[in-house]
């Protein structure tokens, strides 16, 4: 992460970019949030770890409307999204300085909680650098551990690959995480009878409260 911060400061200092789009620390160790950084000093709040799962490509839609170039940190999967937005002329390639960042799979705090780990105060082992395969979770009840792989987001288990499809420079190494078939769930649904499919979608759509979270999380949202 320090290499990423150092490079961001250099690009701001020499005028290559006027802002950096990355992640800042949240209230808790496991909820970093997307943020703009416009000064080298503000980058003290910059973070990049296993919980930075948010895709920053869609934020470039608005950033493309601003004056000057934006340095944006994109994981390998995020670059697919950026390319799609580029094809739809929704982002301006000339307004983006893309730094491809390494990824070894992103983490899901809900999976950790479902393991019975409660009262979480902090988590170590989520750093991007290093080959830690175990997370150490500091809780109000003492330290707990779990396998990094067991806490990964479902989408990381069906990762399309760790190759960045578009970038200006690369920082950090990636680690393959795919260990499942991307279309297994699709095939399961396709194998259902019409009655089973109807019941399945009825159950899924019954959860909808029109919060627009599905729209916000969609990597392109061009429906």
Name each region found by the language model.
Residues 153-156, 205-211, 215:
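Residues immediately within or flanking Cys/His clusters that coordinate Zn2+
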Residues 221-223:
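Short, intrinsically disordered, charge-balanced linker/junction segments flanking boundaries
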Residues 1-201, 219:
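Iron-sulfur-associated redox domains of electron-transfer enzymes in respiratory
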């Amino acid at each position: 992460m320090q290499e990423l911060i150092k490079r961001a400061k250099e690009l701001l200092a020499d005028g290559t970019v006027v802002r950096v789009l990355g992640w800042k620390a949240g209230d808790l160790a496991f909820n970093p949030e997307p943020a703009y950084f416009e000064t080298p000093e503000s980058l003290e709040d910059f973070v990049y770890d296993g919980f930075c799962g948010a895709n920053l490509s869609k934020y470039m839609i608005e950033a493309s409307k601003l004056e000057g170039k934006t340095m944006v940190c994109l994981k390998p999967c995020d670059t697919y999204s950026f390319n799609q937005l580029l094809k739809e002329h929704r982002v301006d390639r000339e307004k983006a300085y893309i730094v491809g960042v390494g990824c070894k799979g992103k983490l899901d705090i809900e999976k950790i909680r479902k393991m019975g780990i409660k009262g979480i105060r902090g988590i170590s082992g989520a750093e991007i650098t290093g080959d830690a395969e175990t997370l150490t979770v500091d809780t109000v009840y003492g330290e707990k551990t779990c396998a990094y792989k067991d806490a990964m987001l479902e989408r990381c288990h069906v990762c399309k690959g760790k190759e960045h499809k578009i970038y200006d420079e690369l920082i950090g190494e990636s680690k393959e995480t795919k260990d499942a078939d991307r279309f297994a769930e699709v095939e399961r649904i396709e194998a259902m009878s019409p009655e089973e499919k109807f019941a399945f979608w009825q159950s899924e759509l019954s959860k909808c409260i029109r919060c627009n979270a599905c729209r916000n999380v969609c990597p392109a949202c061009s429906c």
